[in-house]
Design a protein with these regions (language model features):
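C-terminal tail/sorting-segment detector
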Residues: 470-482
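A recurrent domain-boundary module in secreted/ectodomain proteins
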Residues: 43, 420-439
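Consensus positions within tandem repeat domains that build extended binding/scaffold surfaces
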Residues: 118-119, 151-154, 174-179, 199-202, ...
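N-terminal segments that cap or nucleate solenoid repeat domains
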Residues: 20-91
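Bacterial Sec-dependent N-terminal signal peptides
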Residues: 1-23
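Terminal processing/anchoring signals of secreted or surface-associated proteins
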Residues: 77, 418, 438-443, 459, ...
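Structural signature of tandem-repeat unit edges
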Residues: 24-28, 52-58, 75-83, 99-113, ...
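Residue-level detector of functionally pivotal "anchor" positions at catalytic/ligand-binding pockets or at interdomain
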Residues: 434-458
Length: 482
């Protein structure tokens, strides 16, 4: 038996509790060691007399009998007729103990339309004492269109697998179904209408999976770590999608992420470490931006903060060094630890009147910052850093990482409060004003169409509106189309 070995790594994916529990370190939980391979599975070579192909018609449960003495000799197998769970075990056996590398089931009928759990992954492959997994030879499989479900771990650790098709009637893929299929390649993965859920870690660590993913209008959920470390560059998020799990796209190569308003359940680390991500649109209605949502997205330039957001989670946009100034909405109350740390292209921060808390070092290393506006009449509470003792949300008193001599504009009559408030006393230049930029006033009018309630993007009252311009009405941005 030819053996392909690598050091055994255990990855534990546990579902997080949203809301109260936000401390789980998804990156730590998903971090894996590098694999060490000894030999590759054999490849099919045209004209190779040693390459053994067979064409078999199965009647369900009799595949082993039909293969007979060839079970460990066959390289390529075309299957017609009915295939059941017993036959899938035979196929695994032929690929594990033999050299079966190519399976064509295009004209077969799989019983109940289900690829069973652990179809090509068995505990016999694991040598815990020696710390390795013996891999099967399977390199390519063609599935029939009648497949409706691919169950848990069906192709887990089939590292040699390079090619697989998505059946046209597929509705569900179970947890870890293709986890660690790190040679799997596809220019695109197109999921059919009727497909509703990509479960946990479905394509986790499929590091050669590039190109685009096309989701149908029926998709409801993308599970935790579904594409963790896959290198997909594009995916659509249809209206109707309700949930994106923790670390679902962590370590991918997405260039944009436009999330529909139906997606109200976002997991922590969901888009962490997407090095090419430039644009992100978050859905209206969410009240919290999750921890590490776009952490280390070093190319991110634009993101919106929906008007419904009340808190921005820990490290949400940490190390987004190209991120343009963000509009913080009225209603925002908390900015948590390290949320905007090292967003060094920010030129200004405009804190709304509702802000009452700034977490540890949330605004440190904003080296390009030129001004701060804070509409709150009472200085928001500043949390002291636990890592760098004595550090404020903006930096250390003796080693300022964010400029401390920039103008800080506060409401008339509030400057002295800010000068005496711990954390805010980091700054030396407070200026009282009642002329704040837009997005921090709560604009109220008796009639929403009243000209007295319309402002431009600099916060100035407008008497004559113009087609094609953006204005602030009742605290919201409005594009005037006509």
């Amino acid at each position: 038996m030819k053996i392909l070995q690598f050091f055994l790594v255990f990855i534990t994916f546990t579902m997080s509790t949203y809301g109260q529990q936000t401390d789980a370190d998804i990156v730590g939980r998903l971090k894996t060691n590098s694999y060490k391979y000894s030999i590759k599975a054999p490849k099919a070579i045209d004209g190779n007399s040693d390459f053994n192909s067979m064409d078999i018609t199965s009647h369900g449960g009799d595949l082993a009998k039909l293969l007979g003495d060839n079970i460990y000799k066959v390289d390529s197998l075309v299957i017609r007729g009915t295939v059941d769970d017993v036959d899938f075990h035979t196929l695994w056996d032929a690929s594990f103990n033999g050299k079966l590398s190519v399976i064509n089931m295009e004209n077969a009928e799989v019983k109940n339309g289900i690829i069973p759990e652990d179809a090509f992954w068995h505990s016999e492959q694991v040598n815990i004492k020696e710390g390795y997994i013996t891999l099967i030879h399977l390199r390519r499989i063609i599935l029939p269109n009648g497949i409706k479900r691919i169950e848990d771990s069906a192709f887990s650790y089939v590292v040699n697998l390079e090619d697989i098709n998505i059946p046209s009637e597929l509705q569900y893929i179970g947890p870890s179904a293709f986890e660690q299929c790190e040679n799997l390649k596809a220019d695109s993965l197109v999921f059919p209408e009727g497909f509703e859920k990509l479960d946990r870690a479905v394509f986790a660590s499929c590091t050669r999976l590039t190109g685009k993913v096309v989701l149908p209008s029926t998709i409801k959920e993308i599970g935790e770590a579904a594409f963790w470390r896959a290198k997909i560059s594009s995916i659509n998020f249809p209206e109707g999608l309700e949930k994106i799990g923790d670390a679902a796209f962590s370590g991918c190569r997405l260039e944009e992420a436009y999330l529909p308003n139906s997606c109200q359940d976002l997991g922590i680390f969901a888009f962490h470490l997407n090095l090419k991500l430039k644009e992100m649109h978050l859905p209206d209605g969410i009240e919290r931006i999750p921890n590490n949502l776009a952490d280390a997205c070093i190319s991110l330039c634009h993101v919106n903060i929906p008007s419904s957001v009340k808190s921005i989670g820990k490290e949400a946009f940490q190390n987004c060094g190209l991120l343009n100034d963000v509009d913080l909405p009225l209603g925002l109350e908390r900015i948590e630890k390290d949320a905007f740390q090292s967003c060094n292209t920010f030129s200004q921060l405009v804190f709304p009147a509702t802000l009452n808390f700034l977490g540890e070092e949330c605004c440190t290393y904003l080296t390009g910052l030129k001004r701060i506006y804070c509409m709150a009449s009472e200085p928001p509470v500043c949390e002291v850093s636990k890592l760098n003792i004595g550090y404020t949300p903006f930096g250390g008193y003796d080693s300022p990482s964010t400029p401390n001599d920039i103008p800080v504009y506060v409401p008339v009559g509030a400057a002295e409060k800010y000068r005496k408030a711990w954390g805010w006393d980091y700054f030396t230049n407070f200026i009282e004003t009642d002329d704040f930029p837009t997005a921090i006033y709560d604009v109220t009018t008796e009639h929403s169409d009243s000209k007295s309630g319309i402002y431009d993007l600099n916060g100035r009252k407008v008497t004559d509106t113009q087609k094609g311009h953006i204005y602030i009405m009742n605290g919201k941005k409005v594009f005037l189309a006509r």
